[in-house]
Amino acid sequence: EAMRGCGGGCDFCDVNKRSKKDLPLERLKHEAKINLDYGFDSIWLHSDEMLLYGCDNREFVPNRDAITELWRGLKSLGPNFIGTTHMTFSGVAADPKLIHDISEINEMQKNGRWLSTNLGIETVAPSMVKKHLGVKTKPFSTDEWGSVVREGAKILNENHWFPAATIIIGWPDETPDEVQYTIDMMTDFRATNFRGLVAPLLYQDFSEKNSMHFGNLNEAQFTLFWKCWENNLRVINDIIPIILRNKTYGPAMKVFMYGIIKAGTWAIMRYLRGLCKDLFNGRTPDEIVEKYARSRSVSAPKIETKRL
């Protein structure tokens, strides 16, 4: 654990209630060395928002010096790489050079390695961002969030980071036009050959009556769910060769993983086709998705990333 707390203030998340705490490099080196001596060959830093490590300002601009010092200090112990569990797209877009620097410390361009990290998108509809995402978009404005996510995804891919992102479907106060913003983002991801997974999560509330269930999806929400899994199917097919080339796994494990991945994605798409027919009087996903194929949302303003 490298740090805890994020201060983002999202109204659906308990993590933002934690006080922020950064653990010092010497302690992290001590803990990492125990694992390396035990036989592990890499270091994974758990965090609620790694790019806030050492942050010393209220605008949430990443502290590049503190983070690169952390990466270099841990890399000096001899691991193959240092990964992290969580980042934010706003932190990535605010300092592209930081992402380049930690990738360079990991020698990711040199050895071709890709690392995954978790990031929350949740929604890119400006009105929903203002209502629910607190200050998650800092140092950018809430109106810029859609462009921040697109730019952040591009920066991560350019530096061999594989985003595992989440979105939330079925907010109680969400309209179809607001869902369209996120549908358009998924369309843009496909057009730019985005390499990353997007997990669609149904909104869950402390009150059961306000929680979303599959049987309550409207056409726009189903379209977004479908678009996410279309993206995931495309990306999974793209990364299977990477898995097969991975020397960590033996031939039997590679065959097993290939089978699980293919069978799992096939089962999910089959379930969604059946769900579509049940929800919308026998209509197919293609018929539903076609209605939302053309952009109806207002594009978020283009951003100038704050290069520090």
Can you say where each PLM-predicted feature lies in the sequence?
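Canonical Radical SAM [4Fe-4S] cluster-binding loop centered on the CxxxCxxC motif
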Residues: 1-27
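Flexible glycine/acidic-rich beta-alpha junction loops that bind and position SAM and/or redox cofactors
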Residues: 8, 44-59, 122-134, 169-177, ...
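Acidic-and-aromatic substrate-binding clefts and catalytic sites of carbohydrate-active enzymes
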Residues: 21, 28, 90-97, 171-177, ...
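Conserved, mostly hydrophobic/aromatic
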Residues: 28, 119, 186
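Catalytic cores of alpha/beta
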Residues: 98-102, 172-188
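Radical SAM enzyme core and accessory elements
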Residues: 227, 231-308
